[in-house]
Amino acid sequence: NVSSTTAYQPVPSLAVYAAAKAFVLSFSQSLWYEARQHGVTVFSFAPGPTHTEFFDVIGDNATAVGRMQSADQVAAAGLRALDRRFTPPSAVSGVGNAITAALARLVPRRVLMPALARSLRPVDTKR
């Protein structure tokens, strides 16, 4: 299942997207545990900012400039994670994204939320 690094943190102006991706992550991790005794592999992959049309659609390319992975890099990272001898319940693409996801869980929300709000501008819903 495809999640996102937004699953690891609240994202002002993308609240529904972040919540949906958090659901995918949590659901997949639970299913990973439940299904493994039956020989079924369930996996959640969380790419970070990826060079696609997504940022063009929301009108914000500046947020992730310099941190974006290509779609090929993301796909290769996902396949590497799936190819491990023991597939983990989830994986994040890229070392920088994995560090960011881990730190987002450690930083108090009262500190994290204003920083995220400053780095993201609201989506223009009138387009």
State where each predicted segment sits.
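Active-site-adjacent segment of SDR/Rossmann-fold oxidoreductases
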Residues: 9, 30-41
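Catalytic tyrosine of NAD(P)H-dependent dehydrogenase/reductases that use a Tyr as the general acid/base
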Residues: 17, 25
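C-terminal helical subdomain
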Residues: 44, 62-101
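Short, flexible catalytic-loop segment of classical short-chain dehydrogenase/reductase
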Residues: 47-57, 61-62
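Active-site loop immediately N-terminal to the catalytic Tyr-X3-Lys motif
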Residues: 11-15
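Active-site helix of classical SDR
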Residues: 20
